Amino acid sequence: EQALLQYVSREAARTAMNLLVKRDYAEAELYRKLRDKGYSEFFAGKGIEYVSAYHYLDDARYARQMIGSRKDTTSRKMMVSRMRQKGLSDEVIQEAMEEADWTDEMGLTRELRRRFSSAEQIESLTDKDRQKLIQSLMRKGYGYSDIQHVIRHLDELEEGTIWN
């Protein structure tokens, strides 16, 4: 019986390692994956313990990587939502967000630069197209007031860094 417990524990740890080889996971996400693969709560926990002991699993690092890879295309609000879906704790999320040098205004300017080659293009939009743009940005999680602020100050942004 002891040998069987050790064997299944090793298999759970091996499965966790194989999953982590492909990509990083949040602890809760990896736990769900192990459970989906048929491991009981006990053995899924053993697999998590093993990879955590060797620092292969680190929620804070995972949160920082998520922010680094998505901050150019996602609002802070949307990022927090995605992190919660991955099972990251509010403490880890808050810490990672505080460390990040990132504002929604920066994300909006990057998004506008990606879509338009100059500020004049945005200013020349019809009211209908401007509303479509605003709605599109709001679906990405940006606030209406932030969007209005960035669009209103495009001339300053043009002189600064966005289109230079």
Predicted segment positions?
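An alpha-helical, amphipathic repeat domain used for nucleic-acid recognition
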Residues: E1-N164
